[in-house]
Amino acid sequence: MEDCFLISAAVYSPSEKDAIAESDPTEPLSPYGATKLLSEQLINKVGVAENFTSISLRYFNVVGSANIDFGDNSRDNLVPKVFAAIKAGKRPEIYGDDYPTKDGTCIRDYIHVQDLAEAHLVALKQLEKGKVDEIYNVGSGTGYSVKEMMEQMSKSMGVDLNPVTVPRRAGDSPKLIASIKKIEKDLGWRPKATLKEMIDSAWAAEKGAK
């Protein structure tokens, strides 16, 4: 028996490194990250006990849409949260601008949902070839700050977002950027979408939402 599981980059400890590798420490700050790490540990235990083969994909921040009819309804994520604020006539919020980053806002690695889906398919094909128990990061390998994201969103949407800074949220790491060297080497996977393409597709789906 084999399967591919989606975990999350939220399992990682806060890091000053330019890119986080799969072997880096996992001490999540948030309850969400803790539950994802527990899931991964349980998968590993089942694999040992039941001869269960798996690949876990630690995905970073998913953005965009592969179909105009399917947008992101998770209002906890940055991009749809900004969309919701603008549509409601409110100013989008930046949670803290005093982090040890280039502009004081959190830095994250964003990946298009279509690229994530393709990584999943590549992982499943690898499982079909034989016994594999691996963990892979799935991201773009590039980090963007909240302010940089909002600048691109402003361009894609054609509006001035005029964000307001509010206090930090508990559990937010200053920086999370994926090292994707392992998945590139082992599976031959690389992301294709640019940040502009991610946000353009997300905005198109948001406008097309019924």
Where are these regions (language model features)?
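Conserved NAD(P)H cofactor-binding loop of Rossmann-fold oxidoreductase domains
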Residues: 7-9
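Catalytic helix-loop patch of NAD(P)-dependent Rossmann-fold dehydrogenases
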Residues: 11-61, 67-77
